[in-house]
Amino acid sequence: MKKLILLVVGVSLFAIPSPAQSVDASVSYSYFRLGGSSAVNQNGVSGSLAFNHLWFGIAGDFGVYHATPSGVSLNTYTFLFGPRLTLRNPTHINPFVQGLAGGSRLSAGYGGTSAASNQFAFAFGGGVDIGLLPHIALRPQVDYVGLHNAGQTVNCTRVSLGLVLHL
């Protein structure tokens, strides 16, 4: 009986939330440059959700980007996950870096025909959260995004600007 009580108390202590834990949710306008020298410029929206403990967090990052080069409707979707390291300081300017991996989907349509492909995706980059209000920050961010399919990698750049809600 004594062991059962100690077990219940021990498990209960792990369930108590720590004040250092937080959640960040962001929504941003994103400029996505798909490819290298003959690249396609896409505009879209990206969002992320990060679960943080002090300086370390796990982030999920999702994006939708669109362009219509030469009448072809081109859409890129990204869904990435990975670690985010944040330097938290009292000046309300918190830089971060992240390394993410996941997948992407490219789809193109023209004149009633369409095609799509899925590929492995990864991203490395960072940004800075600039505090505006107690729980709201402005987030400029730049990432290198690689889309890997059939032994080739398409090099992409994503530049974003949005708002973050710190919960």
Regions found by a protein language model. Give the residues of each.
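Transmembrane beta-strand segments of Gram-negative outer membrane beta-barrel proteins
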Residues: 21-33, 95-99
